From Swiss-Prot:
Signal peptide: none
Active site: 213
The protein, known as: Mannitol-1-phosphate 5-dehydrogenase
Species assigned in the record: Paracoccidioides brasiliensis
GO cellular component, one term: cytosol
């Protein structure tokens, strides 16, 4: 019997990143989603194409050997697949983890496989697998919780690959950048050993990789998006052609680099080279990366452990400079009432209806006595005065 992976999330990251490498590693991939259109399309097609984009051109890969299940209508089938799978992965968004936990918990509970299930959440969030693990424990009978480690092992991961705006007529095919990084902690697998998945870089300590990625790639990308959007630039490439915006991105990443170098003992020269590589990647004209796509979901991106407040809070606690990060926060606060982005409308409502203090607390979860709080409050007050 061959290897099997169940993947929650039939979107672009699921098909064009996780699914691609599971397929290349010899797994049959079972996609699980609640979107009828995605599942119907996957069930009808025997393959789809992933197109990797780089400065050298395009490279196409055909993905086959997969199935798809609609968890909205066939949840029992999903549970059965999990019970006999080798790996479960997900790319659904951090807010959806609590909804996929119950079927995973049930699938784990009825497992009879000798080897524990490997569970890896592939989300843009720190400790996403730990979060999912907590929800799974909550959905496991108390009498069975102590034996959960014998049936499943949970490893956090950091993923990095840009998926630009897709052609609306592309169907299941995915256009994606050639560069990727998928780092997963190996310690949770112990003597059993980690699953054999191509592309994964297995490490003992994941935190430096997660924070370096989140506070460089995601912070830089979002900074370019918000400054670009407010300056009327259509794409990230166009935004970074503007010297004013490029210098703002560099200033923000100089601040986050100071944190990464000091906290994780990464050599300054290595971090500098990493930053330059990231700026080159996100400014790739072939990606046609639209600023609205990169800036979407501003409430999540302004939250406590995310790409702006996360590093800024740590820097403020260390007494270090956060001027450029606060400039990026101001631009993010202006990302309001953007078509097809529900959170941007909610942001407008919060800034319009709440006091500056209440809005600051709601958006960032910072306590008033935190050293970063007054800096954010100042930006919220300023944007509120400009918001109509």
């Amino acid at each position: 019997m061959g290897k099997k992976a169940v993947h929650f999330g039939g979107g672009n990251i699921g098909r064009g990143f996780v699914g691609e490498f599971l397929h290349e590693s010899g797994y049959e991939v079972v996609f699980v989603d609640v979107m009828d259109s995605v599942i119907d399309a996957l069930q009808k097609a025997s393959s789809y194409t992933v197109t990797e984009i780089s400065g050298e051109g395009e490279h196409k890969k055909v993905i086959e050997n997969y199935r798809a299940i609609n968890s909205k209508h066939n949840l029992d089938d999903v549970i059965k697949e999990i019970s006999t799978a080798d790996v479960v992965t997900c790319a659904v968004g951090p807010n959806i983890l609590k909804f996929i936990a119950p079927p995973i918990a049930k699938g784990i509970d009825i497992r009879t496989q000798p080897k524990p299930l490997a569970v890896i959440a592939c989300e843009n969030a720190i400790g996403a697998t730990d979060t999912l693990h907590g929800f799974i424990k909550d959905n496991t009978d108390e009498s069975r919780r102590d034996s959960l480690p014998s049936r499943a092992q949970f490893a956090n991961s950091a993923i990095d690959r840009i998926v630009p705006t897709q052609d609306p007529n592309s169907g299941l095919d995915v256009k994606i950048e050639k560069f990727y990084e998928w780092v997963v902690e190996k310690t949770p697998f112990g003597d059993v050993g980690h699953p054999d998945i191509k592309a994964i870089h297995w490490v003992d300590n994941l935190e430096p990789y997660i924070e370096r990625k989140l506070f460089t790639v995601n912070t830089g990308h979002a900074t370019a998006a918000y400054f670009g959007y407010n300056a009327g630039k259509p794409t990230i490439h166009d935004a970074l052609k503007d010297e004013r915006i490029r210098s703002q991105v560099n200033a923000v990443l100089a601040e986050t680099s100071a944190l990464i170098v000091e906290k994780h003992h990464i050599p300054a020269e290595e971090q500098h080279d990493y930053v330059q590589k990231i700026i080159t990647r996100i400014s790739n004209p072939y990606l046609e990366d639209v600023v609205q796509r990169v800036g979407r979901a501003p409430l999540r991106k302004l939250s406590r452990k995310e790409r702006f407040i996360g590093p800024a809070a740590q820097l403020a606690e260390r007494g270090q400079q956060v001027d450029a990060l606060m400039g990026a926060v101001e631009e993010a606060l202006k990302f309001q009432n953007v078509p097809d982005d529900e959170e941007s409308f909610e942001l407008h409502k919060i800034l319009k209806e709440l006091s500056a203090a209440d809005a600051t607390t709601k958006l960032t979860d910072l306590e008033p006595d935190h050293p970063l709080y007054p800096r954010v409050l100042e930006k919220v007050t300023k944007v509120q005065s400009e918001t109509k």
